[in-house]
Amino acid sequence: MNKLSVVILAAGKGTRMYSDLPKVLHKIAGKPMVKHVIDTAKKLSAAQIHLIYGHGADLLKQHLADEPVNWVFQSEQLGTGHAMQQAAPFFQDDENIVMLYGDVPLISKETLECLISQKPENGIALLTVNLDNPTGYGRVIRENGTVTAIVEQKDANPEQLKITEVNTGVMVSDGASFRKWLARLDNNNAQGEYYMTDVIGLANQDGLKVVAVQAKDLMEVEGVNNRLQLANLERHFQRKQVEKLLLAGVTFADPARFDLRGELTHGKDVEIDINVIIEGTVRLGNNVFIGAGCVLKNCTIADNVEIKPYSVIEDAIVGNNAKIGPFSRLRPGAELSENTHVGNFVEIKKAQIGKGSKVNHLSYIGDAEVGHHCNIGAGVITCNYDGANKFKTLIGDNVFVGSDSQLVAPLTIASGATIGAGTTVTKDVQENELVITRVPQRHISNWQRPKRK
């Protein structure tokens, strides 16, 4: 039986989160918890992913619109068994069904593969964990290695309370067996709900085997009910990411002060200072230094690049030997060639900066092409927007643009041109021309400053 489908329970409200956002949409590492679980299901090559939803239906569908899930509505939240009953009509007899939870985001593909491999024919494989303090959790009762029951804390006798192995709620069985047991569930309990733990007893009644597989990492099966638990899982996840990067050769000034909210690939001798955030897909070359407080999102950084503190780079490409920052911003579409310098309080948007060119201070370069070996002075602005449309500025090679100049697009400045400081350029400039529109300087001798009356 190789076919596999996954059911993800995500209908709960999450009252203890004190939020209008459904609990499963709260984020770990910049991604909704339920999206972590969906991604893990994809890694298992699940034929179908059934998502049980209820509270916050519109928000869930909005956030997960692109996900390949079968939406299964649970109008009332009447327990885990009731949630599985909603998905049961979609189960095929000959497929394995894995039951997961949208608020248990760190469950791994490897743990689930181990669980699936241990499932007995027509029986159940149940994921469990040992806790130093199992108070409040359902105890796993075994006889001769087989799980015979899950006993809740309030129903356990003194001997059962000594058991430290508890139920995580994650289980796998075949579709036919699940449908059979789900049809036999009842809600004869104090809460009036249908519980999946009762399936264990039903399997035993049918003479079928229930095996327990213990999770190696407690945090994989930790659920989230409040923001403290969310924060604890966030820190655990970040520690695991940093450990992998450290072992792969990345240097961190302080591993506890780094956040990875996506995917990071890197070359050799990469050094990352404190409070750096990586989002989306980021690729770093060799000998890259990232200063304190930088944010990088969906960008490619080549070899020998220095990114000084508090720079923000998004959807951009940076060439070899570039220097960026401090306090630089590269917006989507920014492309820096090799040996470029972009300095403090410079913003580059949808613009290409040629080899060896410098934009060192207090400038905005948008919708532009800057040639090789240009010098863009402090306070230069490409005026690319007329209130309705965007226009482009084209600058050739070896151009010098003096400080506090405005380049009003559409505009072409040919190679070798010089723009004097304080110039507003509104017409195209030819090769090797000097353009200056500065008001003539006046000197007034013996000037008396106004005095207060």
UniProtKB/Swiss-Prot annotation:
Top enzyme category: transferase
Subunit structure, as described in the record: Homotrimer.
E.C. numbers: 2.7.7.23, 2.3.1.157
Protein's name in the database: Bifunctional protein GlmU
SUPFAM superfamilies: Nucleotide-diphospho-sugar transferases, Trimeric LpxA-like enzymes
Organism: Histophilus somni (strain 129Pt)
Binding site for UDP-N-acetyl-alpha-D-glucosamine: 9-12, 23, 74, 79-80, 101-103, 138, 152, 167, 225, 331, 349, 364, 375
GO cellular component terms given for this protein: cytoplasm; membrane
NCBIfam families registered for this protein in UniProt: glmU, PRK09451.1
Family annotation (Gene3D superfamilies): Hexapeptide repeat proteins, Spore Coat Polysaccharide Biosynthesis Protein SpsA, Chain A
Listed HAMAP family: GlmU
Family stated for the protein in its record: In the N-terminal section; belongs to the N-acetylglucosamine-1-phosphate uridyltransferase family. In the C-terminal section; belongs to the transferase hexapeptide repeat family.
Domain of life, source organism: Bacteria
Residue ranges of the region described as Linker: 228-248
Cofactor binding note from Swiss-Prot or TrEMBL: Binds 1 Mg(2+) ion per subunit.
Keyword Ribonucleoprotein in annotation: no
Catalytic activity annotation: alpha-D-glucosamine 1-phosphate + acetyl-CoA = N-acetyl-alpha-D-glucosamine 1-phosphate + CoA + H(+); N-acetyl-alpha-D-glucosamine 1-phosphate + UTP + H(+) = UDP-N-acetyl-alpha-D-glucosamine + diphosphate
Positions with a binding annotation for Mg(2+): D103, N225
Single annotated GO MF: glucosamine-1-phosphate N-acetyltransferase activity
Amino acids binding acetyl-CoA: A378, N384, Y385, S403, A421, R438
Keywords: Acyltransferase, Cell shape, Cell wall biogenesis/degradation, Cytoplasm, Magnesium, Metal-binding, Multifunctional enzyme, Nucleotidyltransferase, Peptidoglycan synthesis, Repeat, Transferase
Pathway annotation from the record: Nucleotide-sugar biosynthesis; UDP-N-acetyl-alpha-D-glucosamine biosynthesis; N-acetyl-alpha-D-glucosamine 1-phosphate from alpha-D-glucosamine 6-phosphate (route II): step 2/2; Nucleotide-sugar biosynthesis; UDP-N-acetyl-alpha-D-glucosamine biosynthesis; UDP-N-acetyl-alpha-D-glucosamine from N-acetyl-alpha-D-glucosamine 1-phosphate: step 1/1; Bacterial outer membrane biogenesis; LPS lipid A biosynthesis
PROSITE patterns attached to this UniProt entry: HEXAPEP_TRANSFERASES
Keyword Translocase included in the entry's annotation: no
CDD domains, per database record: GT2_GlmU_N_bac, LbH_GlmU_C
Pfam families: Hexapep (PF00132), NTP_transf_3 (PF12804)
